[in-house]
Amino acid sequence: MAFLDEYAAVMNRHTGLKVYNGFRRGHTGLSIDAGFGSGMLLWLEDGQYCFDEEERGKVRKGGCFSSPSVELTQKVMVNYTVSILRHRLGLPVLGVPTKADELPSGWVLQETPTWRFVALDGPQGEHLEFAASGARYCVALAWLYDVSPSELLNAYMLPDGGPLLRQWLGYPYLR
């Protein structure tokens, strides 16, 4: 959970958001207050790490993305909130792929009949388990499979995204 302290420090310092890491104090969530009653949450619910936007002070059960892996959920949170950070730093638009047809070669997105995405399987036997309400939350996870949330956050803070993200300079953000 050390990454959440790093994330909170970066976002608090550079964005004007108020990020509170409750996990650090034994609570089960991280809150991102965007002001005017809006924000985002990363929380632990029934063994799943969930992420979603807060709407009128509430979030949907399970969030827009959930996984037993806190690292996967942290990457989704970073990809979702990075537009705020890059804008405040005066950096150009840089977003990772978000559409199912933009998966890297050999990766397959598993979908349920209820239009919920539940896993990504990679060409080398990789299996990422989650529940997502849209492909836009999980496609980037295939591209960023072997990248830590900290490496991802730091790459987003480079003007051109560095070697990790440079290829997507100018792509639209996840929103």
Model region roles, listed by residue range:
Residues 40-44, 61-69, 121-136:
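Short amphipathic beta-strand/extended segments with alternating polar/hydrophobic composition
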Residues 34-62, 175:
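Short aromatic-glycine-(Arg/Gly/Cys) micro-motifs in beta-strand/loop hairpins
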Residues 57-71, 142-143, 147:
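Acidic, aromatic-enriched beta-alpha/helix-loop junctions
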Residues 22-45, 112-122:
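Amphipathic, interaction-prone secondary-structure segments
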Residues 67-123:
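Surface-exposed beta-loop interaction hotspot
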Residues 1-23, 27:
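Leu/Val/Ala/Ile-rich N-terminal alpha-helices, chiefly Sec-type signal peptides and the beginnings
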Residues 98-175:
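Intrinsically disordered, low-complexity, charge-dense segments enriched in Lys/Arg
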Residues 13-20, 35-40, 100-112:
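Short small/polar-residue motifs
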